[in-house]
């Protein structure tokens, strides 16, 4: 696991966007796994700027979804499919034909989960998976004590998560679905490169537990310690609880430029 400490969220976004751009230059049809939420927005904004400037071509790029609400129509403005269309696909000039995600409205949700897991493998696998992290260490909707070998499956949202997400539904918690489909931790770990971005002091404890703590289901993101190519990008605030922060700064500062992240 590599830990990169950057000054702020904008710098983190630019660093990860450049890693995605380098990947697309090597492999134009790369499958990028993307996450929703406010944390990854600087990544998408920086990558979109590269597309507009002609620094990278996304004509053949493909996008894979991390999770989706169950029972929310795909055309609903707050379905994650709609959110990703607005925040990722349209700014990057990628057609919906190049997008893959689970069917949250399927009559047989379990079959839909299994079908998406199979589709990810059949597509050749995710080349780079971008993740955020919750204050409790969750990745995707894999909450604490999720199996570290879990596959794409249905999960029940905690009441706190529904309260937190109500702001996207006009403040009405009754509109927030109770269930989601999420890639499992085992599924996430199959990506060739996993990049986790964390910003803000509120994520400091989770980052420290994930990077320097034991690999344990109580902190789902700690499973990234087992991945052969995992990169954790954090701003100074999110890095504030890391005991090895100076070591991480030193090693990255002296890393050969050609290695990237």
From Swiss-Prot:
Pfam family of the protein (one): Glucosamine_iso
Molecular function, one GO term: glucosamine-6-phosphate deaminase activity
Highest taxon, organism lineage: Bacteria
Pathway where this protein functions: Amino-sugar metabolism; N-acetylneuraminate degradation; D-fructose 6-phosphate from N-acetylneuraminate: step 5/5
EC nos: 3.5.99.6
Inducers of expression: Expression is repressed by DasR in the absence of GlcN6P.
UniProt keyword Metal-binding present: no
GO cellular component annotations of the record: cytoplasm
GO biological process, one term: glucosamine catabolic process
Gene3D superfamilies recorded: 3.40.50.1360
Residues at the catalytic site: 67 (proton acceptor), 136 (for ring-opening step), 138 (proton acceptor), 143 (for ring-opening step)
Record InterPro entries: Glc/Gal-6P_isomerase, Glucosamine6P_isomerase, Glucosamine6P_isomerase_CS, NagB/RpiA_transferase-like
Keywords: Carbohydrate metabolism, Hydrolase
Enzyme class per UniProt: hydrolase
Catalysed conversion reaction: alpha-D-glucosamine 6-phosphate + H2O = beta-D-fructose 6-phosphate + NH4(+)
UniProt entry tagged with the keyword Ligase: no
PANTHER family: GLUCOSAMINE-6-PHOSPHATE ISOMERASE
Function: Catalyzes the reversible isomerization-deamination of glucosamine 6-phosphate (GlcN6P) to form fructose 6-phosphate (Fru6P) and ammonium ion.
Family: Belongs to the glucosamine/galactosamine-6-phosphate isomerase family. NagB subfamily.
Protein name per UniProt: Glucosamine-6-phosphate deaminase
Taxonomic source organism: Streptomyces coelicolor (strain ATCC BAA-471 / A3(2) / M145)
Gene: nagB
